[in-house]
UniProtKB/Swiss-Prot annotation:
SUPFAM superfamilies: (Phosphotyrosine protein) phosphatases II
UniProt cross-references to InterPro entries, sorted A to Z: Atypical_DUSP_subfamB, Dual-sp_phosphatase_cat-dom, Prot-tyrosine_phosphatase-like, Tyr_Pase_AS, Tyr_Pase_dom, TYR_PHOSPHATASE_DUAL_dom
One Gene Ontology molecular-function label: MAP kinase tyrosine/serine/threonine phosphatase activity
The protein's role, per its UniProt record: Protein phosphatase component of the sperm flagellar doublet microtubules. May act as a regulator of sperm motility by mediating dephosphorylation of sperm doublet microtubule proteins. Can dephosphorylate single and diphosphorylated synthetic MAPK peptides, with preference for the phosphotyrosine and diphosphorylated forms over phosphothreonine.
GO biological process: flagellated sperm motility; protein localization to organelle; protein targeting to membrane; protein targeting to mitochondrion
Assembly with partners or alone: Microtubule inner protein component of sperm flagellar doublet microtubules.
Main location: cytoplasm
Tyrosine-protein phosphatase domain boundaries: 20-161
Family classification: Belongs to the protein-tyrosine phosphatase family. Non-receptor class dual specificity subfamily.
Name the UniProt record assigns to this protein: Dual specificity phosphatase 21
GO cellular component: axonemal A tubule inner sheath; extrinsic component of membrane; mitochondrial inner membrane; mitochondrial intermembrane space; mitochondrial matrix; mitochondrion; nucleus; sperm flagellum
Amino acid sequence: MTTASCIFPSQATQQDNIYGLSQITASLFISNSAVANDKLTLSNNHITTIINVSAEVVNTFFEDIQYVQVPVSDAPNSYLYDFFDPIADHIHGVEMRNGRTLLHCAAGVSRSATLCLAYLMKYHNMTLLDAHTWTKTCRPIIRPNNGFWEQLIHYEFKLFSRNTVRMIYSPIGLIPNIYEKEAYLMELM
């Protein structure tokens, strides 16, 4: 499935939302830790499940919200792969019960984005490239670390027996090929 733009364009254009809450699908949101602990924002967006993808962020437990903890650090050697299927299944289950899920880490940039991409590949039949393009349109600040990219590339191959993103060598080190132009421009500076 290729999608030209986010179905929630206001999320991508409102400056105050770039770092806060971003809606990815009708039932899935990504945010930083501050939003995940903001009862009014959670209530206004009808969040029923919060998935905390961090080892360092403490949950504020609100009534009527289910909490799931994925205690992983944002480091290239951290292992998220074993969480891809169970978390994607959980997000899908919440959606099937007409609930809404908030995925968050500390900044809403790497860990939560990684699990979002895995979910979109599994349940929206998106390639990794399409899932990244879609999510980045909805939340421009996403940038999974290189270790998570390698795990996502492996997961895409497991799901589809092909890859749309690959790791390449650049002047700044090993990067996903979708960042090749950006790395080249950085080198020119």
